[in-house]
Amino acid sequence: MSKLTTGSFSIEDLESVQITINNIVGAAKEAAEEKAKELVNAGPTLFAGLESYRDDWNFKLLDRYEPVITPMCDQCCYCTYGPCDLSGNKRGACGIDMLGHNGREFFLRVITGTACHAAHGRHLLDHLIETFGEDLPLNLGQSNVLTPNITISTGLSPKTLGEVKPAMEYVEEQLTQLLATVHAGQESAEIDYDSKALFSGSLDHVGMEISDIVQVTAYDFPRADPEAPLIEIGMGTIDKSKPFLCVIGHNVAGVTYMMDYMEDHDLTDKMEIAGLCCTAIDLTRYKEADRRPPYAKVIGSMSKELKVIRSGMPDVIVVDEQCVRGDIVPEAQKLMIPVIASNPKIMYGLPNRTDADVDETIEELRSGKIPGCVMLDYDKLGEICIRLTMEMAPIRDASGITAIPTDEEFTNWVMKCADCGACMIACPEELDIPEAMGFAKEGDYSYLDILHDQCIGCRRCEQVCKKEIPILNIIEKAAQKQISEEKGLMRAGRGQVSDAEIRAEGLNLVMGTTPGIIAIIGCPNYPEGTKDVYYIAEEFLKRNFIVVTTGCGAMDIGMFKDEDGKTLYERFPGGFECGGLANIGSCVSNAHITGAAEKVAAIFAQRTLEGNLAEIGDYVLNRVGACGLAWGAFSQKASSIGTGCNILGIPAVLGPHSSKYRRALIAKNYEEDKWKVYDARNGQEMAIPPAPEFLLTTAETWQEAIPMMAKACIRPSDNNMGRSIKLTHWMELHKKYLGSKPEDWWKFVRNEADLPLATREALLKELEKEHGWEIDWKRKKVISGPKIKFDVSAQPTNLKRLCKEA
């Protein structure tokens, strides 16, 4: 085909000519930008760029919540000038210092996570438009506010798949700009890297929102459904007598074709399909909008991947993208398990059979001629995976292949342990494997059994063992009874929080009478096993907090039962309500959690969403009690999700490993000048309590995290009843888990009505004796003492431009 050159041509004299114009690059976004400019009440940051939030909002956050850096090392190895020693306030050859370099390191993690979700969204959007067409209406349930994150960043409110495209192009364009700042000789100021990280976090929630709204719409996922079906979860739920197809990753597009093939060929009760990570959550949402009886199952999080493979249960493994182990092919190959890569982001060096014949490909995989293949044609993928699973099952059953040792092999391996401690040093969780091996030598396997839940399945211990003991296999052998009983229930991801739920809870959240929203999200890098998140969720649910979950956290909460044999999903309702446990969905569903906070501002307070992030973030920071928990955070995506919460004024608590992200955002509660805002009624300064006192921090134990999170739900706008309720929970939890009353509780008291009702008199005495407050004991009222005054009609804001005098 000849190359078109610049110029013009005429078709005046041609006959029967048809000209088809498909996509004009950038045209959709340009048209959307022009349309957004026509909005009457839009905020100041339509299609926000790198600098848009910097001065008006980000720097205000960073002034109060100062970055606390935790470098992993003192060197910079970015370019060929290096490596440069940045210790002792030295600068590198390019001029950057440790602060700037560390800011860049954290920022790089955030944009990596943002890119991951954005690419996920792009893949789904393109595939679903190709399959269902651009005109498919977005259907997320009974809501009018469908896309709060898209709207807050761009001003757009898409109603169809096609109308989502400009928002996708916007995220991709800004990601390119952000990535460019990482290059040597670009940004060097730590505070500006933090500002850019916050901006990237906001983009991450747009990318996640795109991913979930298009799949909820096209795949008939539950739509804001508080009674979505309960799904079986755990390794013990797999029927070993049936062929088993195991899917791993986060992008469910290809898996839907496998499920369609199973249903078309009446195989849903003749084989097992189950998953790990968020693909597992989303495959159990597929076609569940009408609450049909589910047949797909969830095994668990990334920490279970190697454990499941070593068990020998899967007959075929299919991977897509994100949080997939890098050693799946060699591990599966040892056990005759074919591996099929269904997404170009993970191809493992496998031969590409996308254009090959289905029968020939199945024969290559069945015979072991190739260990696996790349298959990007989803129609073929669905057929190959199901047929291959049915064919591999009898072959593998006949061979009896498993990595789990026999009783004799188990004893021999245990006796080989030299108690050198190398495994414990290598273990990310510092598990006392030598101690467990010592007890096993004496016939007590309970210590190894306990390690099963605490072990994250990384096999670092095996690689340093001088005796070449397959330590993971030993642990799994000892835990066989526990594994067989690992049967829980998880509510299928329900999707967005509906407008009706926001109207019902908005007032309670802003006034403080609903104590807060606790969002349990993130990965499985827990310091002491998965049950930590169960304990945390149960504590807050019993205290009438709204608990929302996604991803690995949602799975792990469903793994455990009470003395009556019920999981938390069975014990508590699935709505966005006081004492409700709402599984929102997979990782990309996290956008609906920030979306819920944004919808409180939009629906309850009638604040403009369009291009108005700073005002919405200001509203949430001052009025909506919410705190995130990523107790096992390990990935770059976790850092971008958390940072996206931070820019909206939502604090997050991370587990002890998360200091490796290199940065926290912590305020100094004793710097009184940092705890002043404007009263929007008149522009006058007003003092507020130090709440929340961090945006991003870590805790050492789950017992420390619980009171920390309860405190982080206190907000300046709480009314007396709300403040009293929140102080009650915080002080009780502090006493329960840390053994004492918090030292700074009095800083949050504005008058006697703020005090917990049951202990009001005792606390008034303490205020008088310890802090010099004047108390009218006849009326039991505070006469003087508080530095913070209570005014029920005050309108706290950090933004001077929102004041009436402005």
From Swiss-Prot:
Binding-site residues for CO, renumbered to this chain: 117
GO MF annotations, alphabetized: 4 iron, 4 sulfur cluster binding; anaerobic carbon-monoxide dehydrogenase activity; hydroxylamine reductase activity; iron ion binding; nickel cation binding; peroxidase activity
Keywords linked to the UniProt accession: 4Fe-4S, Iron, Iron-sulfur, Metal-binding, Methanogenesis, Nickel, Oxidoreductase, Repeat
UniProt KW Oxidoreductase keyword: yes
InterPro entries: 4Fe4S_Fe-S-bd, 4Fe4S_Fe_S_CS, CdhA, HCP/CODH, Prismane-like_a/b-sand, Prismane-like_sf
Binding site for [4Fe-4S] cluster 1: 73, 77
Annotated CDD domains: ACS_1 (cd01916)
Keyword Electron transport: no
Family in the record: Belongs to the Ni-containing carbon monoxide dehydrogenase family.
Domain notes: Cluster B is an all-cysteinyl-liganded 4Fe-4S cluster; cluster C is a mixed Ni-Fe-S cluster which is the active site of CO oxidation. Cluster D is also an all-cysteinyl-liganded 4Fe-4S cluster that bridges the two subunits of the CODH dimer. Contains two additional 4Fe-4S clusters, dubbed E and F, that probably transport electrons from ferredoxin to the B cluster.
Protein name, UniProt field: Acetyl-CoA decarbonylase/synthase complex subunit alpha 1
Lineage: Archaea, Methanobacteriati, Methanobacteriota, Stenosarchaea group, Methanomicrobia
